[in-house]
């Protein structure tokens, strides 16, 4: 922060107080006292400004401000948040939230600004596709998913019969969203959604979710303690947003409540209902990997630019194993788009309307591909035929835990060995990549894993 910037900040906070003093009956007997108050405030302001400037500039460089400024900034941020929340009351009431409900759940609400940072970093948009998929569709998740299918076979059979969505697809959503219910989020939804309603981008969207969360509590579907989830407001086994819950959640176990938190049955059925309502076509595939003839141009092709399978056949497109693309329940008139998530040198896919239904769950092609691929693997299919165009492929969660264990042994403070790559792990990886002479990308890829294994092997031989 520059000197002048902070001087303006101090004046900004104290000027209203000075104006109040000036405007308070200047002709009264208190005039003289008011002027003394103003002089005191001006002196305090100048003192604070000078004091903070001395702290801010050391050797010509900006450093951390003192606690006085921080307290002022924190107070102002808190006041701004409370003012924003109060201004939302009319809008909330127009959406069906009662005055008493709004007051009850907002009177002690405080902001959580960490969610703003997460809003600006979403791995499905910023992580290389091979990293994203390797962590979500690994042997560990595949095997556990198969166990879950067997464990919930009766319920899944009923769900599939009711909604026409395969058990493997429903369970794949469950696996990607919460690792089959084991990681559903610990954020207080009202705090997260309240903050996102007043800060950052997409405030209008998050306000709708904020009000929906209060309506859920108002109806008594869930308690506030149960309404915990992701930083963005998704909750339960299959991570529904509050408005999606209101629209599509179902009471499949017949207990009179739509419970995506404690009832696996309700969660699985609600997920199938979601996909059905978003256009899932029973008996049709989501898509499949294909290969194209040499010289084939993918320019202009996309998931949205769908064409008949007969037109793709005419252009020489076949399945990745070389077999014809028109098989089973597919017709020449079936519509599919060509998707190339890593460009022409990576795997290519023809995708149908069922892929779009999955995509609507979370609008990212990498996310939809993770669920689609996991559903195939749960049915016994193998991995993609064509490799991703990288010399540093992604790692599984087991391999990521191996990397984290090594980093801990090197003295890095990165938290638990859980296979989840956060900022601290990425920073530590960058340091080790430089140590090994690798490009400091911060990625938990195969190159750093091999370097670690080589290092450990050398230690074992000594």
Name each region found by the language model:
Residues 6-14, 47:
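Aromatic (phenylalanine/tyrosine) cluster motif
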């Amino acid at each position: 922060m520059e000197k002048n910037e902070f001087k303006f900040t101090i004046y900004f906070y104290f000027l209203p107080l000075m104006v109040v003093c000036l405007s308070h009956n200047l002709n009264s007997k208190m005039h003289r006292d008011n002027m003394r108050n103003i002089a005191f405030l001006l002196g305090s302001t100048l003192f604070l400004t000078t004091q903070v400037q001395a702290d801010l500039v050391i050797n010509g460089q900006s450093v951390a401000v003192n606690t006085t400024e921080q307290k002022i900034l924190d107070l102002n941020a808190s006041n701004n948040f409370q003012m924003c929340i109060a201004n939302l009351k009319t809008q909330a009431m127009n959406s069906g939230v009662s005055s008493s409900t709004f007051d009850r759940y907002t009177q002690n609400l405080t902001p959580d600004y960490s969610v703003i940072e997460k809003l600006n970093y979403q791995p499905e948009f910023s992580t290389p596709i091979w990293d994203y998929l390797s962590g979500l569709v690994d042997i560990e998740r595949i095997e556990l998913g198969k166990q879950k299918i067997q464990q919930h076979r009766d319920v899944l059979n009923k769900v599939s019969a009711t909604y026409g969505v395969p058990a493997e697809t429903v369970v794949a959503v469950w696996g990607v969203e919460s690792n089959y219910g084991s990681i559903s989020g610990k954020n207080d939804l009202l705090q997260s959604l309240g903050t996102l309603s007043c800060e950052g981008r997409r405030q209008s969207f998050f306000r709708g979710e904020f009000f929906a969360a209060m309506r859920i509590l108002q109806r008594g579907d869930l308690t506030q303690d149960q309404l915990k989830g992701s930083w963005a407001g998704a909750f339960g086994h299959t991570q529904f947003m509050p408005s999606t819950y209101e629209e599509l959640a179902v009471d499949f176990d017949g207990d009179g409540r739509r419970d995506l938190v404690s009832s696996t049955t309700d969660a699985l059925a609600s997920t199938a209902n979601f996909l059905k309502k978003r256009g899932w076509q029973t008996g049709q595939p989501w898509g499949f990997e294909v290969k194209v003839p040499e010289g084939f141009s993918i320019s202009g092709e996309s998931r949205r630019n769908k064409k008949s399978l007969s037109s793709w056949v005419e252009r020489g497109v076949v399945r990745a194993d070389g077999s014809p693309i028109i098989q089973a329940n597919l017709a020449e008139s079936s519509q599919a788009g060509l998707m190339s998530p890593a460009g022409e040198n990576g795997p290519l896919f023809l995708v149908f309307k069922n892929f779009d239904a999955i995509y609507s769950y979370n609008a990212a092609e990498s996310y939809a591909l993770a669920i689609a691929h996991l559903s195939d693997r749960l049915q016994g299919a193998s991995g993609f035929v064509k490799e991703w165009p990288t010399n540093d492929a992604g790692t599984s969660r087991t391999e990521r835990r191996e990397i984290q264990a090594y980093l801990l042994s090197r003295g890095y403070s990165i938290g638990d060995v859980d296979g989840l790559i956060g900022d601290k792990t990425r920073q530590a990886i960058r340091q080790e990549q430089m140590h090994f002479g690798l490009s400091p990308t911060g990625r938990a890829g195969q190159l750093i894993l091999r370097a670690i294994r080589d290092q450990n092997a050398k230690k074992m031989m000594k």
